[in-house]
Amino acid sequence: GLLIGRKGEGADKIKAQITGIMKKIKAEIPKEIKLTVEEIQYPESSAMILAQMAAENLEKRMPFRRTMKQIMEKAMASNGVKGIKVAMSGRLDGSEMGRKEWLRKGRIPLQTLRADIDFAREKAHLPYGDIGIKVWTYKGDKFDK
C-alpha cells in the first residue's frame, strides 16, 4: 500500500510518469511497460523507506531530532531489526553553519562482513538548503549454508 496504493491504482500513475520522462529525453517508448511489484513484509525494517519517511517529515518542517527518534523507534519496533543508525547533515534547523548529527540504537557492526546491514541515502529539500539523510539498519548475521 505505500507506493502502489490499494488495488494497484498507483501502478498506472507510475507508468504514465515513466512515459513522460521518456518523452522528455526523446527516448524510444516501448508499446507496453511491464511493472513488477514486490511486497515488502516489514516496511519499517527497510532503510530506504525509513530514509524517505525522514525526508518527508523534514520537508513538513518537523524538527530533525524528533524525526530521527521517531524513525529509530519505528525501526526498532519492527520485526527483525537489531540495530539502527541515523545520520543527518546540512543546515539542521536552518542554522548558519552546516553540521552533522547522528543517533544509534542497538548494534551496527559495520566491520563485520557477514552482518546483514541495509543502507540508504536520501535528500530532504528545504527552503534554506538540502539536508542529507543516511540510514543503516542491522538485521542480524547472514550465514551461508
Language model regions located:
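RNA-contacting regions in translation and RNA-metabolism proteins
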Residues: 1-145
